[in-house]
Amino acid sequence: MSKLFSEYKLKDVTLKNRIVMSPMCMYSVENKDGIATDFHFAHYVSRAAGGTGLVILEATAVQEVGRISEFDLGLWNDEQVPALKRLVDGLHYHGAKAGIQLAHAGRKAVLPGEIVAPSAIPFDEKSAKPVELTKEAIKEVVADFKRAAYRAKEAGFDVIEIHAAHGYLIHQFLSPITNRREDNYGGPAGNRYKILSDIIKAVKEVWDGPIIVRVSATDYAHGGLQLEDHIPFAKWMKADGVELIDVSTGGLVNVAPPVFPGYQVPFADEIRRGAGIATGALGLITRGEQAEEILCNERADLIIVGRELLRNPYFAKDAAEQLGETIEGPKQYSRAWK
């Protein structure tokens, strides 16, 4: 059997293969209430039917002010749980594990009213200027991640991912470009890491399942975070109980990175080796042979697929065929699934 289609354990959760659907915002909430819709059900469950091992839902806001837009999913209140539970049940029906990415947009929120950030620095000249979070407000953000994690558990999710990448709130704290604070949340790397550490520890108080953290391994900007900065961050995350790091790049500033097949894989490789922690690789991974090479050369532990799963819900089936394997599909499709 190929490594791509071997099982993988995240703590006590066993994935049937190493294909993960990347969290990707769909901006499809209908009533600006954060509640998942029929679109979300069809979108995610179809990828589970296609053979994906772990489906991670898009950035789901822990506070109403933490949405990227008014059309994002949320877990800031109990009314948002039932629709997510229905979705999780659909994923489980098809043999996939269910993950959810808990997030706060910080200064990248495009919402009416006040937005917040570690420091009062806007994303760009066209963006609203955020209000600097007080220490009390930071503690409330941490508490809301904990509350959202509890609701995720109530909905039946198997895995939680904390979004610390792409220029959103936690990433804003981590990077010296966006964090100019002079208290114990700013300055040295250990201080800038504090909010993420506090969130991980708070989540673990109500959640005993695996925790993944998504990071941006480089800011692609002078004075920003580079790969070498993420090795100590990754070591601290491992010590705090994180199972795996989902390694992306960019998003903090308005810079277009160089993009080519597998362009982010070297970052996952270096963090894996430098910090001794499992990683997920992503970045234009589109074929089974490409994914298999990454795993067999121990450059990452999981393959996180984004745009290719938007184009093809049956990526897992096609990847298996490319590797000379056959995987079991939905029994309803047996006449065509060969």
Curated annotation (Swiss-Prot):
Keyword Protein biosynthesis: no
Enzyme Commission numbers on file: 1.6.99.1
GO MF terms held by the record: FMN binding; NADP binding; NADPH dehydrogenase activity
InterPro entries xref list: Aldolase_TIM (IPR013785), NADPH_DH_bac (IPR023663), OxRdtase_FMN_N (IPR001155), YqjM-like (IPR044152)
Known cofactor(s): FMN
Binding site for substrate: 27, 163-166
Taxonomy, superkingdom: Bacteria
Stated role: Catalyzes the reduction of the double bond of an array of alpha,beta-unsaturated aldehydes and ketones. It also reduces the nitro group of nitroester and nitroaromatic compounds. It could have a role in detoxification processes.
Name of the protein described by the UniProt record: NADPH dehydrogenase
Organism for this UniProt entry: Listeria monocytogenes serotype 4a (strain HCC23)
